């Protein structure tokens, strides 16, 4: 996958197009990511020990990884991702500016 947990991304298609957020979790086997504040759904929860009231809560749902683009650290604009080897390690870099995305 071209994005990882902690990356700042922008949604490029769907109902939340244009929104930006940080990736909270990545699910590589399903090709989906959980982005903070994006794709909010209402979830009905039964009363339990932790939540005796129960009710309806709003939470993020995963979206397909093809619908997000990482933001370039230099320009703050969405960018495609390239890979190159630096000091024997494969790193991701922003195609827009050439800036390395991996810390």
Curated annotation (Swiss-Prot):
Q: Which UniProt keywords apply?
A: Ribonucleoprotein, Ribosomal protein, RNA-binding, rRNA-binding
- Which domain of life does this protein belong to? Bacteria
Could you cite one Gene Ontology molecular function of this protein? structural constituent of ribosome
Q: Which GO terms describe its cellular component?
A: ribonucleoprotein complex; ribosome
Please list the GO biological process terms of this entry.
Answer: translation
Q: How does it assemble?
A: Part of the 50S ribosomal subunit.
Q: To which protein family does this belong?
A: Belongs to the universal ribosomal protein uL24 family.
* Function statement: One of two assembly initiator proteins, it binds directly to the 5'-end of the 23S rRNA, where it nucleates assembly of the 50S subunit.
HAMAP family per record: Ribosomal_uL24_B
Q: What is this protein called?
A: Large ribosomal subunit protein uL24
Primary gene name: rplX
């Amino acid at each position: 996958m071209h994005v990882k947990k902690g990356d700042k991304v922008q949604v490029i298609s769907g109902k939340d197009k244009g929104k930006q957020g940080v990736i909270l979790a990545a699910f590589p086997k399903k090709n989906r990511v959980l982005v903070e504040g994006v794709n909010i759904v209402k979830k009905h929860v039964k009363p339990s020990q932790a939540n005796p009231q129960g009710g309806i809560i709003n939470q993020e749902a995963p979206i397909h990884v093809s619908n997000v683009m990482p933001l370039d650290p230099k320009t703050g604009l969405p960018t495609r991702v390239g890979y190159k080897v630096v000091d024997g390690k494969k790193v991701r870099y922003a195609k827009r500016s050439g800036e390395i995305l991996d810390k």
